[in-house]
Amino acid sequence: TGSEGTIGCLDSDDCYTDAHGVDVDYLTMHVWIKNWNWFDPQRPEETLPAAKEKVRAYLARHVAIADSLDKPLVVEEFGCPRDKESYVPDSPVSIRDDYFKFLFDLIYENASNRGPLAGSNFWAWGGYGKPDQDRTYWGPGDDATGDPPQEPQGLYSIFASDATTLEIIQRQGQAMRAVKP
């Protein structure tokens, strides 16, 4: 019974309290700063600081819900486009790296203080895939880049060449493994 969080439930906490009984082991949530219009990749300096504050508040709300239900919480989908929303694998990722580090720090801080945050799953592993530069959306025979076919290919992809992002993800994995339950 995965959930996007309260945004996917008309901004109501009831999606958790009504659907997560004793047979559900943990809660999930998404954080989509671009899709939810909290962040504009064409104006990152203007919009990223406010987006981070919205993320902080949204996460705190879900932590409180998880606490009230005595369940762990996983940020199971989140992503941020490459700089200037480029889909090209070798384009810069400095904004995404900044955002990932911010979100990972919030998750780690909560987990290391015995809060309900138990982990996260970034969206999405693109690996060695390459988006077709002649069209935006996936087509038969195209590489898989992690993004669904109805979204621009490479929009949220983490490619094998994204060394700085992969380093941030690896550090978060190591930090979370060291957290004692």
Functional labels for PLM-detected ranges:
Residues T1-E109:
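Extracellular glycoside hydrolase catalytic/binding regions
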Residues Y16-D23, A50, E85, P89-P181:
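Aromatic-rich peripheral "rim/lid" segments of glycoside hydrolase catalytic domains that contact
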